[in-house]
């Protein structure tokens, strides 16, 4: 299983309002005709079991919701789980890493709008993390586009 890292997003990450700290962080998964993640460190097609590192989640962010828009579906039978891992690779006793914090075994092979399906209580990240999509079911062998929005409050480091 490979870990494929998406290059840093060139989109600006704003969202704070004068009366609160609500933020929406955006990430995009776009693949070419052979199924490889564009703008990443790999030219190989995304295989079942690959971890896609979509980008940073800041320390002190409350993870409240995720909205995933599958506008151009992946190959039939491709599924995914969406969660997070800490940048330093070391788990936290307070908030353990969770590879399916937002959802698990959800189809990415059909156009849809997906929401957080895990009923776990919102958590505040005690240290910097990475948003991770882990694929399953089948390899992707086609062009696709999936846009991910993580919604939460930037409450600050503890």
Report the location of each language-model feature.
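Surface-exposed, low-hydrophobicity beta-strand/loop segments enriched in small/polar/acidic residues
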Residues: 2-158
